[in-house]
């Protein structure tokens, strides 16, 4: 719950915290690549005011991959087929580079027909400023701050006879 409370507080607020059950890792065979794929973290929870349970799938990603959204969709489809429950997919990107914002959707379509649009929640640590989490008592914040970035502010002041200039550069 600490992870959700830190990064997805609105969603965390809808979960009954007494209902969280972590499930065993799921293994799938990728018949195209001939590899075994593992769903890293899967939890079953109840949402406040509902009797039915949902699944939360958290997939850590330590390297940038263009096919990651597609892979996460495949995991989603297989989990949905097996469990027949609503699934809240979350990716946590812990890579240092690239610094560009990661893609958080996978689409299949044609110019006049959108067949599929799969979206997922994403926490991209290199897009977060560690200083924003410094005063949090959440242990997850302490553990992940090393992978976060620092937004650096440089103030340059040049004083010349007769006038002064100040410029601000954000890196």
Give residue spans per PLM region.
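Conserved single-residue anchors adjacent to enzymatic active/cofactor-binding motifs
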Residues: 1-171
């Amino acid at each position: 719950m600490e992870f959700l409370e830190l990064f997805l507080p609105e969603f965390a607020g809808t979960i009954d915290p007494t209902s969280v059950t972590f499930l065993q890792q799921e293994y799938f065979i990728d018949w195209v690549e001939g590899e075994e794929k593992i769903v890293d973290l899967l939890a079953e929870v109840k949402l406040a005011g509902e009797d039915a349970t949902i699944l939360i799938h958290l997939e850590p990603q330590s390297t940038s991959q263009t096919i990651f959204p597609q892979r996460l969709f495949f995991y989603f489809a297989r989990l949905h087929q097996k469990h027949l429950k609503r699934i809240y997919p979350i990716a946590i990107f812990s890579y240092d580079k690239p610094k560009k914002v990661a893609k958080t959707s996978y689409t299949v379509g044609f110019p006049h027909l959108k067949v599929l649009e799969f979206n997922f929640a994403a926490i991209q640590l290199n897009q977060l400023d560690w200083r924003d989490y410094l005063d949090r008592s959440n242990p997850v914040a302490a553990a992940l701050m090393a992978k976060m970035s620092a937004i650096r502010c440089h103030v340059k002041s040049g004083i010349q006879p007769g006038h002064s200039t100040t410029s601000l550069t954000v890196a």
